[in-house]
Regions:
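N-terminal "domain-start" segment that seeds a small globular fold
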Residues: 33-63
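Thiol-/selenol-based redox modules, centered on thioredoxin-like
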Residues: 153-195
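Short loop/turn microsegments at loop-to-beta-strand junctions
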Residues: 48-49, 70, 158-160
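N-terminal secretory signal peptides that target proteins for export/translocation
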Residues: 1-9
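Short active-site neighborhood of thiol/selenol oxidoreductases, capturing the structured segment around
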Residues: 62-85
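Structural microenvironment flanking redox-active thiols in thiol-disulfide oxidoreductases
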Residues: 83-137
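Bacterial N-terminal signal peptides
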Residues: 12-29
Length: 195
């Protein structure tokens, strides 16, 4: 009895971690997206707020670097979690289609540069993954969230995507994205609208 109780105590932290990771993989529809009262949330037709963040290579990347291209700016909660991996793999798989549409995919989360570097190397992602560790850009884009079941994770990026036209204007928003099939959804929108 004593051994089974101590074994249960030893595995409890792993169980709690597994629950937190499962919560991250669950579509964000079930997690509250929080917006501070003073938080600027861009709208369709407005100029996309510019920013500079470090990429997985540790190099600063600015939104204005992509002027003249369509930008698929997608926010996601956490590197190497199931839902985020599904979404990132699909964006990577479809890179040639994005390039053919003069579009670039840019991922943003609150993970560190080192975390992005490790994940991109492990899973072969070549598009830009930007680190917003201080959470300023996710707030600028109204894309912050918390997971009540995993408060230890703090504020994360909500799974939202913004399509920015070659002039820097927000032309489409996908809010509370389901990672399954999202790249196809974005490509379909670009096929109909990116002329």
């Amino acid at each position: 009895m004593k051994n089974s109780r101590s074994a249960a105590v030893r595995i409890l932290p792993y169980f709690l971690l597994a629950v937190a990771l499962m919560a991250l993989s669950y579509p964000v529809v079930h997690a509250p997206v929080t917006h501070a009262d003073d938080q600027a949330v861009p709208t369709i037709g407005s100029m996309a707020p510019d920013f500079t963040l470090d990429s997985q290579e540790g190099k600063p990347i600015s939104l204005h670097d992509f002027k003249g291209k369509w930008v698929v700016l997608y926010f996601y909660p956490k590197d190497q979690t199931p839902g985020c991996t599904i979404e990132a793999h699909a964006f990577q798989r479809d890179q040639a289609q994005y390039e053919a549409k003069n579009a670039v995919v840019v991922g943003v989360s609150v993970d560190t540069v080192e975390s992005h570097k490790e994940w991109c190397a492990k899973d072969g992602m070549s598009f830009k993954m930007l680190s917003d560790a201080d959470k300023k850009v996710v707030a600028m884009y109204g894309s912050t969230m918390t997971i009540p079941q995993a408060p230890q994770l703090g504020t994360l990026a909500a799974r939202n995507t913004f399509i920015i036209d070659p002039n820097g204007k927000i032309v489409k928003e996908f809010i509370k994205v389901n990672p399954q099939g999202h790249s196809e959804e974005v490509l379909a929108w670009l096929a109909d609208n990116a002329k």
